């Protein structure tokens, strides 16, 4: 009895789906549905021939090639005077006139004077430029001496050592230190590593 009720309700649903709200079948209702209005063929052709902006053919178009551009119209932008200076070489950047035949009575010396002047200017410029770097270096002679004193305090404390006078005790200690450093750990000879290098022997 329950199954028959289920079957009856299913059939009723199918019948309701087949009939539309007006009471007409679904196929007839879909045929009468107003679709999008398609304009006639004459109107379509007229819309395709709508006046567009006239584009001249490629032969008529007169574009400037990159070689025809003036120096001030460079496509990359920026200053072209700098590029011209760089292309001419370092002599153009220094603004020194080239030595010609009308130099004067002492042609060779007068021509060499500006070059010598520019070289001295360049040398002083490089020395002033490298001075801060020289000051920042930590491996100077004095720094190395300080490190040597810190690592080998007994080496520099000998009396009478030094350059020309005295008994040369520092040299003796230097030789002993070399021998002491030469006798290595575990029977191996150490070449440049000192006894205070932290090998633990």
From Swiss-Prot:
Region annotation (Disordered) ranges: 90-172
One GO molecular-function entry: hormone activity
UniProt key word Disulfide bond: yes
Keywords: Cleavage on pair of basic residues, Disulfide bond, Hypotensive agent, Metalloenzyme inhibitor, Metalloprotease inhibitor, Protease inhibitor, Pyrrolidone carboxylic acid, Secreted, Signal, Toxin, Vasoactive, Vasodilator
Propeptide residue interval(s): 24-47, 58-60, 67-95, 107-179
Cysteine disulfide partners in this protein: 185-201
Family membership: In the N-terminal section; belongs to the bradykinin-potentiating peptide family. In the central section; belongs to the bradykinin inhibitor peptide family.
Protein name (Swiss-Prot/TrEMBL): Bradykinin potentiating and C-type natriuretic peptides
Species name: Sistrurus catenatus edwardsii
């Amino acid at each position: 009895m329950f199954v028959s009720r289920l079957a009856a309700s299913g059939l009723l649903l199918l019948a309701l789906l087949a009939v539309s709200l007006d009471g007409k079948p679904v196929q007839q209702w879909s045929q009468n549905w107003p679709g999008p209005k398609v304009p006639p063929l004459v109107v379509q052709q007229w819309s395709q021939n709508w006046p567009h902006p006239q584009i001249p053919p490629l032969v008529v178009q007169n574009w400037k090639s990159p070689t025809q551009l003036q120096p001030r119209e460079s496509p990359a932008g920026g200053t072209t005077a700098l590029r011209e200076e760089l292309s001419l070489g370092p002599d153009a950047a220094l603004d020194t006139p080239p030595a010609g035949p009308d130099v004067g009575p002492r042609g060779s010396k007068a021509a060499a004077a500006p070059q010598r002047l520019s070289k001295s200017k360049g040398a002083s410029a490089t020395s002033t430029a490298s001075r801060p770097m020289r000051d920042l270096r930590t491996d100077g002679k004095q720094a190395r001496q300080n490190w040597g004193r810190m690592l080998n305090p007994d080496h520099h404390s000998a009396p009478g050592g030094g350059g020309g006078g005295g008994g040369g005790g520092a040299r003796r200690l230097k030789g002993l230190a070399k021998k002491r450093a030469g006798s290595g750990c575990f029977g191996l000879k150490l070449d440049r590593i000192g006894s205070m290098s932290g090998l633990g022997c």
